[in-house]
Every structure is written in C-alpha cells, then in structure tokens.
Amino acid sequence: MRKKKIILATLLILPLSQALAVDCKNAATQQDMSQCANLNYKKADAELNRTYKDLLAKTTVAQRPLLKSAQLTWIKYRDADCTFQSSATEGGSVHPMIISACLTHKTEERTTQLKSFLNCSEGDLSCPL
C-alpha cells in the first residue's frame, strides 16, 4: 500500500516539475538565470562524483583514506572560496547565480584534475596511480 502511495505521489509531482523547467538558453529573469546556474552546478557535481568514484576504485587500500581526506578538504576550500568570491553580491538577487557559477567552475576544474590521474603517462612520478 505504501509503495502505491509513493508511486502516485511521484506521478503527480513529475508533471509539475516538468512544467517548472526553465529554458536555460532563453532565461530572461534573474530567478531563471539562477536556476540554470544551479542546474549547471548539479551537472558538474554529478560528473565530479562519477570521476571520484572511478578514481577511488583504482586506488590502493593505503591511498583511499588519503584521497577521501583530500577530497573533503577540497570541498571545504571550494565552498569557502566561493563564499568569499561572491561576498560582494551578498543579499542581492544575483548572489545565488554567482555562487553557482563559482561552484561550477571549481568543480569542473577538480573533475579535470581527477580525470588526469586516471590517464597518467607511464613513468609519471607525479601521478598517484
């Protein structure tokens, strides 16, 4: 019975979420632009998570806690740096968009860095794998 309620609720909410979807190529309002910037960040974060999991799977048992610690430290740095970089817009309607854009940029950079570890040249001593 509970499964049926969950399925029914999902079916009722799904059309609403699609109706609220924003055309990011033609976003005209600040709210729409902020929503699109947040969607871009979510996509970048999903790619980072996939790459991180791929890298984690290739590390040795001894390297795993090192990578986990590095990633958690990087997340704290990213969040703090984006908070600083967006501080001039604090309280303004553009603020969420500026934060999302910063998070997206830094997340894409980190993804590129982690992917480079997955594709190291043979003999590259700076590569952990």
Language model features by range: what are they?
Residues 1-8:
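Bacterial N-terminal signal peptides that target proteins for export
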